Amino acid sequence: MESFAYILILGLAIATLFFAIAFRDPPKIGK
């Protein structure tokens, strides 16, 4: 259960960071 919560928080942090960068600048990576 502890690892699940850790992964959930980590994923949420990464998603927030990704969306912040994505909305700040036009996507330049990949596609």
From Swiss-Prot:
It is found in: Cellular thylakoid membrane. NCBIfam families: PRK11875.1. GO terms for cellular component: photosystem II reaction center; plasma membrane-derived thylakoid membrane. The chain crosses the membrane at residues 3-23. InterPro entries: PSII_PsbT, PSII_PsbT_sf. It comes from the Bacteria. One of its GO terms (biological process) is photosynthesis. Keywords: Membrane, Photosynthesis, Photosystem II, Thylakoid, Transmembrane, Transmembrane helix. Belongs to the PsbT family. PSII is composed of 1 copy each of membrane proteins PsbA, PsbB, PsbC, PsbD, PsbE, PsbF, PsbH, PsbI, PsbJ, PsbK, PsbL, PsbM, PsbT, PsbX, PsbY, PsbZ, Psb30/Ycf12, peripheral proteins PsbO, CyanoQ (PsbQ), PsbU, PsbV and a large number of cofactors. It forms dimeric complexes. Found at the monomer-monomer interface of the photosystem II (PS II) dimer, plays a role in assembly and dimerization of PSII. PSII is a light-driven water plastoquinone oxidoreductase, using light energy to abstract electrons from H(2)O, generating a proton gradient subsequently used for ATP formation. It is a single-pass membrane protein. Its main location: membrane. This is Photosystem II reaction center protein T.
